[in-house]
Amino acid sequence: MTTQAPPTSLLPLSPEQLARLQAAVGEFSPTQMAWLSGYFWGMVNQQPGAVASPAVAAPPPVTVTLISASQTGNARRLAEQLRDDLLAAQLSVNLVNAGDYKFKQIAQERLLVVVASTQGEGEPAEEAVALHKFLFSKKAPKLSETAFAVFGLGDTSYEHFCQAGKDFDSKLAELGAQRLLDRVDADVEYQVQAQQWRQQVVATLQAKVPAQSTAPTQFIAPTQSTTPAAAAITSGGTTTVSPYSKTAPLTAQLSVQQKVTGRNSEKDVRHIEIDLGDSGLRYQPGDALGVWFDNDPALVEELLALLWLKGDEPVSIDGQNMPLAQALLSHLELTQNTTLIVDKYAALSRDETLIALLADKPALQLYAKNTPFVDMVRQAPSDLNADQLVGLLRPLTPRLYSIASSQAETENEVHITVGVVRYDIDGRARSGGASGYLADRLEVDGDIRVFIEHNDNFRLPANPETPVIMIGPGTGIAPFRAFMQQREVDGASGKNWLFFGNPHFTEDFLYQVEWQRYVKEGVLTRIDLAWSRDQAHKIYVQDKLREQGAELWNWIQQGAHIYVCGDANRMAKDVEQVLLDVVALHGAMDAEQADEYLSELRQARRYQRDVY
């Protein structure tokens, strides 16, 4: 929630004094600000006739700076929990979103705690990219006066597990900082590890820093990331707390499920509309919809048959007893495999092929990525019992989809654009867990459990006159549909430019009629389209960006905000390289200057990405 300053007429300061004060405090770190607050309090409350002296002022409280580097909200929620723990222990804490952290002040930090998630192939969370770049640059200062701890969040199904956390931990140590605790690398099911780590952090800091005798000062960066992200949304200057979250989702109803790619398309993309009813669930353009799903019953039956299990065997999931079949249907992950699961299953099955695979890490990673658990069991039969099976599998996790609508237009509905995952293994048709559920198994008017994952790192500019550049091939177009709905309702006068790409114009132009209407009515100023397979030479959105480099630079010079949504591993990296090339060429900069310029755009929230 943003707190507005009172009118200057109500302040005990003249406009000139207020201006000087604001200019002065901008130079101080949170620790220095805390000391000054105590110093000024002492000046006001001193005995008559006494002379204020900095030498006798109370020692400044040592502030713990807690940086949240979150991609899907988990790191942010963990950081908020740790903040509350530290406040309860009467320690001064400053919780800040990595994207808002003024990293040039890092040399002044004495106690630093980082909660960092990893995205894609070992990349830091989008909001932490600038901080990551700074620490790995020549400008990073020595941190010999800093003590730190790092908690890494990741997913063992990816090769570079918790790489961002590892990067922050190793670089901080390399710069001279001292570890308070060993780094923790946590998998998808991180809650138990996180709770233990929080207790260790509090105990360690309590031993290192005396508790404050009065309520600790807490400096919070002006960002919604410090509120419970899954349950709060700011609108019109007020914050509305929602009862719905990842752990307490809303049961909504599917109202529309429509294929939006052509009959001959190689892609199966669905437009999904979900009725929120009178739930009061609110979201903003840029947010994501979390979707809980059930596995395919046919997949459950196939797995049970392969293991000679009936499905009625009693098992326990998070302390709740249920039949094995129910656990497999609604509580355990069946469509994603990991190297750790392959390792454990190889030991249980004693399959020679799997055991040999363990010695070849690249081959193991590829196998786990491309072979669902049920197909591994089929290829390497075993006689697991129900408890062994449950012990192998990971808990089911919801999938996040970029929201493709604005409530300013759709009111009590939320729309998403879903690329259905379909593939064959040994002649057997397979589909993605959530995408197959939405496309094939969930019926219209059927119940669906959803929640909003707020993303304050992907927001339209506050000024409606600001130009907007949107780069979203494939299903990456989803949030830009929401952006355009919002800009149209707001009557925003700023220019809008869309870059979109897909294989074929006739089969894969998602929401074609809507974009044509926006162009005709002047809401969409420009649209550049890249059809990769409509000609012999493949053309992608990054090629269109390079082609329009001069005009792109002109828009950037006019203050345009740049947004990128879609594939993190290839498209987003290629687009960023083209942006760097455009900045260097048309801005007359060398590669290092262009990289710094793009980092400055990112810091100013003029370059935002929602990549996955």
Curated annotation (Swiss-Prot):
GO terms for biological process: cysteine biosynthetic process; hydrogen sulfide biosynthetic process; sulfate assimilation. SUPFAM superfamilies: Ferredoxin reductase-like, C-terminal NADP-linked domain, Flavoproteins, Riboflavin synthase domain-like. Binds 1 FAD per subunit. Binds 1 FMN per subunit. Keywords: Amino-acid biosynthesis, Cysteine biosynthesis, Electron transport, FAD, Flavoprotein, FMN, NADP, Oxidoreductase, Transport. It catalyses: hydrogen sulfide + 3 NADP(+) + 3 H2O = sulfite + 3 NADPH + 4 H(+). Pfam families: FAD_binding_1, Flavodoxin_1, NAD_binding_1. Residues 247-461 form the FAD-binding FR-type domain. GO terms for cellular component: cytosol. Residues 64-202 form the Flavodoxin-like domain. Coiled coil: none annotated. FAD binds at residues 335, 369, 399-402, 417-419, 423, 432-435, 612. The keyword S-adenosyl-L-methionine does not apply. Its EC number is 1.8.1.2. It is an enzyme of class 1 (oxidoreductase). Its cofactor is FAD; FMN. NADP(+) binds at residues 532-533, 538-542, 574. Pathway: Sulfur metabolism; hydrogen sulfide biosynthesis; hydrogen sulfide from sulfite (NADPH route): step 1/1. One of its GO terms (molecular function) is sulfite reductase (NADPH) activity. Alpha(8)-beta(8). The alpha component is a flavoprotein, the beta component is a hemoprotein. PANTHER family: NADPH OXIDOREDUCTASE A, NITRIC OXIDE SYNTHASE-RELATED. Belongs to the NADPH-dependent sulphite reductase flavoprotein subunit CysJ family. Component of the sulfite reductase complex that catalyzes the 6-electron reduction of sulfite to sulfide. This is one of several activities required for the biosynthesis of L-cysteine from sulfate. The flavoprotein component catalyzes the electron flow from NADPH -> FAD -> FMN to the hemoprotein component. This is Sulfite reductase [NADPH] flavoprotein alpha-component. It comes from Yersinia pestis (strain Pestoides F). The lineage of its organism: Bacteria, Pseudomonadati, Pseudomonadota, Gammaproteobacteria, Enterobacterales.
